[in-house]
Amino acid sequence: MSATPGSPRPTPLRVDVVIPVLNEAHVLEKSVTEVRAFLAANSDWDWRVVVVDNGSTDGTDRVAKMLVERHGDVQFVQLPQRGRGRALRQAWTQSDADIMSYTDVDLSTELAALPKLVNGVASGQYDLGTGSRLLPDSQTTRSFKREFISRCYNLMIKAVLWTSFSDAQCGFKVVSRRVVQEIVPNIKDQAWFFDTELLVLAEKHGYKIMDIPVRWIEDDDSRVKIVKTAWDDIKGVARLRWTLWFGTFQPASASLPVSSRAPGA
């Protein structure tokens, strides 16, 4: 939307794209370069790429610090403990952005879906958005083993937790400040189940979820131990079912940082 001549320039939407990493020195620079190029070419947001390192031992931190020195729109957060959920919680709750998001470092999910999710949340029509590998229009390339486990897991979630979203664990999500303030503090998991818990708590308490098909290509070098992760997720589902039956949920009111970014910077 163009501004009226002589009127103040509208403040651009502040968007953080978080990339959690663990021992990804070999691919981090390439991935950050791709994300930055996409954002520069496909958005008018005031964006920032936030790399969060969870205890890497391969020099990932050195690569991240080099990227920060080279690019003013890259930020680095270093944590001693592992866990994707822990990384997202730290980055999102420290953010001054209007919209927070994340993508896996392997960029398995095509970035073309990001503007649609961000715009959907920014419009106020949705509170959070997630990519899905399991909708009819999704384009997914992965092994039979991963496809089978993923479909079984998501069917289990629907059966046990009575959810309507299609894919809990796709590493491609967008959230509003409201979700970070009210939902994230209630999430118990610090690892892979964080995504599922985020979506389930949001849906069960009336937050609107945008669920869209994405193009997704499996990373052959993925560090995810899929069988162990699946077992941990099953235990997480059982815990969450118990919480929904017998626990209490109070939307938190976590205080998030006020933006220190210069308008249009």
Predicted regions and their residues:
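Hydrophobic helical membrane-anchoring modules
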Residues: 1-14, 158, 162-163, 186-265
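N-proximal low-complexity "stem/linker" segments adjacent to membrane-targeting elements
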Residues: 1-37
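A conserved acidic beta->alpha catalytic loop
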Residues: 53-61, 107
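Short beta-strand/loop segment that forms part of the nucleotide-sugar
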Residues: 43-56, 77-78
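Short, acidic, metal-binding catalytic loop of nucleotide-sugar glycosyltransferases
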Residues: 34-46
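Acceptor/aglycone-binding surface of glycosyltransferases and processive sugar-polymer synthases
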Residues: 73, 79-95, 99, 111-192, ...
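Acidic helix N-cap motif at the loop->helix transition within catalytic regions
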Residues: 26-30, 58-67
